[in-house]
Design a protein with these regions (language model features):
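Transmembrane alpha-helices and membrane-interface helical segments
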Residues: 165-172, 199-204, 288-295, 348-368
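Transmembrane helices and adjacent periplasmic/lumenal helix-loop junctions
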Residues: 181-202
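Multi-pass, polyprenyl lipid-linked donor-dependent membrane glycosyltransferases
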Residues: 143-162
Length: 451
């Protein structure tokens, strides 16, 4: 049963040099296209001219003040990937710093989508459906609320990729290296990666050979840098874990921010306006339960194991995030002119895994319908089922492609950069004091600002 979680992808003939070159080019274009699409999803102020939340208040300001000090805690743990992006942003002209965060965050998401396309081959033989899976990450309906086009929340895309890395059995050393890098980046950026411990333990049990555990090694290596930072935070009484959310609030949070929002942000609010929040949640939840339950019962052991694993992982992930982040369970979402959902970043992985379960089920239906022989042999009802899945996902993709959120309420970064540079030009001390999180302000040398 556990072995069904780690299938080997069908092996294809080695590509010719021209085919390999074309494939590499196509993949680079796909990541670039995904990056552009993600940047386009930010409404009002362009993503490349807006520095969001900790990108400004923590990572950028601290990179300017203390260059290359990336192994330091914030909120009780290490966030290595956002720290590295912040360091990169500090090395470019000040006016372009916001663009570094935006493009890096979008490129990471696009790269994760491409990685998932490859890593899901053992479960999804259809290349078209694997492309749909990658698109599901790029076009995730809730993404504009917090995670699109910034550095601080790029980690949650990597966490989605880590789920697939834990299941993937790469044949090549390059594939193993990429899987290890994904695992290391995730674990070194958030201790939430602990949720994949049971999955990786199952991998060790099912696949005892050492060559199967590049991802496990990467995950463990991430803890080598993460644990000392967490312990340092406890020693200085700045740890993350202080109080916990009530269990009832946590379950309600999962139902209302994951299940209800799974098929679309605006669609969920429309359902709420008609049926009320709880009934709308029941409608969406029952629909998902029927579809995924049917797939688990009728589409074979591999689909059944995957559906259970994906749903359970998403549930545990959300519960853990909500338990240790009291703010998100006590703050109401907003659907007005400026949309906001507290902690929507924690919905990325569970919502994406629900989409993945639907797509894996669709692949099984397509395969049983004759897709292995050719499209000409696929029964019409099978094509209807796959088309229906596309329509369900497309509703959220279209209606939630771009909308105004609190993500851009910080204003234009270019104006801030000009103000900083003007202040430095007239500074008698050669220093500048700027707003910062945690400490309130930071005073740094004007020589740290690149023009």
């Amino acid at each position: 049963m556990i072995g069904a979680l780690f299938p080997v992808a069908p092996q294809s003939a080695p590509p010719k040099p021209a085919q390999r070159a074309f494939s590499v080019t196509l993949q680079v274009v796909a990541v670039c296209l995904g990056t552009v699409v993600l940047l386009a999803r930010v409404a009002h102020i362009p993503a490349w001219d807006c520095m969001y939340a900790e990108d400004y208040g923590v990572y950028f300001v601290q990179a300017l003040h203390h260059p290359w000090q990336v192994f330091v805690p914030y909120y009780g743990y290490l966030q290595l990937v956002p720290r590295l992006i912040g360091q990169a942003a500090s090395l470019v002209p000040l006016k372009a710093a916001a663009a570094v965060f935006a493009v890096a965050g979008a490129a990471i998401a696009g790269g994760c989508a491409l990685f998932i396309y490859h890593a899901s081959a053992g479960f999804i033989e259809s290349r078209a459906l694997r492309a749909v899976l990658g698109a599901a990450l790029v076009l995730l309906p809730i993404a504009p609320l917090e995670v699109v086009g910034n550095g601080v929340n790029s980690t949650w895309y990597i966490m989605a990729a880590l789920f697939w890395a834990a299941l993937w059995r790469p044949r090549t050393r390059s594939g193993m290296a990429v899987a290890a890098m994904v695992a290391f980046a995730a674990t070194a950026s958030t201790p939430m990666a602990i949720i994949y411990a049971p999955l990786l333990a199952a991998r060790v049990f099912a696949l005892p050979k050492l060559r199967e555990h590049a991802v496990t090694a990467g995950w463990l290596a991430g803890w080598v840098v993460q644990v000392p930072v967490i312990l340092y935070s406890y020693a200085n009484h700045t740890q993350r874990l202080r109080t916990f959310s009530p269990p009832g609030k946590v379950i309600a949070y999962y139902l209302h921010t994951v299940v209800l929002r799974a098929l679309g942000w605006h669609l969920s609010w429309r359902l709420e306006s008609i049926a009320g929040r709880n009934d709308a949640t029941l409608i969406v939840g029952a629909s998902l339960a029927v579809i995924l339950g049917w797939a688990a019962i009728t589409q074979g052991r591999q689909v059944r194991v995957f559906v259970v694993t994906a749903v359970a992982t998403g549930f545990v992930y959300t519960v853990l995030a909500a338990v240790i982040t009291r703010l998100v369970v006590f703050t109401a979402p907003l659907s007005g002119p400026v949309a906001f959902e507290p902690g929507s970043r924690y919905s990325v992985v569970p919502v994406f895994l629900l989409d993945a379960a639907l797509i894996v089920a669709a692949n099984a239906v397509l395969r049983r319908g004759g897709a292995a022989v050719g499209l000409a042999t696929v029964r019409p009802r099978v094509m209807v089922a796959v088309a229906a899945l596309g329509c369900v996902l497309a509703v959220g993709w279209v209606t939630d492609f771009r909308y105004l959120t609190q993500r851009t309420t910080n204003g234009h970064w270019r104006n801030v950069a000009v103000k900083w540079l003007n202040t430095c030009e007239h500074s008698r001390t050669g220093t500048i004091t700027v707003p910062a999180w945690v400490t309130g302000t930071v005073t740094m040398s004007c020589s740290n600002l690149r023009r």
